[in-house]
Amino acid sequence: MYNPPPPSGSQGNNNYYRQPSSTPGVSNPNPQANQFLPPPPSNTQAPRPGFPPSAPPPSAPAGQYSMPPPPQQQQQAGQYGMPPPPSGSGIGTGVSLVKDQQISLSKEDPYLRKLTVGLGWDVNTTPSAPFDLDAVVFMLGANGMVRQPADFIFYNNKQSRDGSIFHHGDNLTGAGDGDDEVVSVNLQAVSPDVTRLVFAVTIHQPELRRQNFGMVPRAFIRIANQETTRNICRYDLTNEGGTNTAMIVGEVYRDPQNPQNWSFIAVGKSFPGGLQFLCQIFGVNAS
């Protein structure tokens, strides 16, 4: 788990992210012991074999998770079935953020209800194998961990159980300008016991392909009002990844004093171990 960042508007030193002492890729049975502070659509792509299974069915035995499943607030079918906005769309440029900077989304746009979260990157043109980067979202409770496996949103689990988050699909190449992957968020539908939405990007099969984030220049995340297409903020990462294979790009989190309000922090923190490592520190069983 990890604690909330400083109040919106301040800049921290990113020390609330601390790596756990357990071995990357091994599920941590005791998250309390190791504190960790702080997309064009395709619905027909076959699931990738061997890595994390989709969320268990709603009929999973009671008590399987440390917290109860979220209230059943499933959205109408097709509410998020539309394609994501065109690449690079949005009115204006929004506030340009630097690493560790925070911004109150609710103050910047008092009528904000739904977000478009666009993530993009360019890749070097000379690697031996094509790049495949994946955007993922972790829905965290107050303890800094997912409440259940369904709170991990990725290419094989595109919609959250409460219907508030929809991943528009995996871009296998990262080609072209603008957004490479898009996530839609209905803030009003996020379960009340979810306090943080962590947006990360990982490299698929980095060891096999001999790739890392040092080969991925010009990555960014942008936040826009989905209903008006107005860009609220954007964070451009510059050589943040080094030899690492997973990166937390930013987080959308509730205001502790007013849970109806939301803020964003530009994180830009990279880690070794790829997607498995992120799953470990946020309590997702990736075995």
UniProtKB/Swiss-Prot annotation:
InterPro entries in alphabetical order: Stress/Tellurium_Resist, TerD
Mapped C- repeat ranges: 60-68, 75-83
Keyword line: cAMP, cAMP-binding, Nucleotide-binding, Nucleus, Repeat
GO annotation, biological process: mRNA splicing, via spliceosome; nuclear mRNA surveillance of spliceosomal pre-mRNA splicing; protein splicing; spliceosomal snRNP assembly
A single cellular component GO annotation: spliceosomal snRNP complex
Biased composition range(s): Pro residues: 49-60
Region (Disordered): 1-94
Regions of compositional bias (Polar residues) in chain numbering: 16-35
Chain intervals for the UniProt region annotation (2 X 9 AA approximate repeats of CABP1 motif C): 60-83
One GO molecular-function entry: pre-mRNA binding
Location within or outside the cell: Nucleus
Subunit structure: Possibly a heterodimer of p31 and p34. p31/p34 could also associate with CABP1A/CABP1B to form an active complex.
Family assignment from sequence similarity: Belongs to the CAPAB/TerDEXZ family.
Protein name, as recorded: cAMP-binding protein 2
Species name: Dictyostelium discoideum (Social amoeba)
